[in-house]
Amino acid sequence: MARKSLCVKAQRTPKFKVRTYNRCPLCGRPRGYMRKFGICRICFRNMASEGLLPGVIKSSW
């Protein structure tokens, strides 16, 4: 419940612009957010391994 309320709170426009922070829309995680994809690293990894993100491939060297 706390995570859900924090997600709703993050969607509101704050009094000052610097107070905005990014949250994953899928799981609500505030840390490990990837701006390019708009999701957290854990959701990114799951979606990439399922093939849901076009153009993303697993690297190997």
From Swiss-Prot:
The gene is rpsZ. Binds 16S rRNA, required for the assembly of 30S particles and may also be responsible for determining the conformation of the 16S rRNA at the A site. It comes from Desulfatibacillum aliphaticivorans. Belongs to the universal ribosomal protein uS14 family. Zinc-binding uS14 subfamily. The keyword Metal-binding applies. It holds the Pfam family Ribosomal_S14. Its cofactor is Zn(2+). Keywords: Metal-binding, Ribonucleoprotein, Ribosomal protein, RNA-binding, rRNA-binding, Zinc. Binds 1 zinc ion per subunit. This is Small ribosomal subunit protein uS14. Part of the 30S ribosomal subunit. Contacts proteins S3 and S10. Zn(2+) binds at residues 24, 27, 40, 43. Disulfide bonds: none annotated. GO terms for biological process: translation.
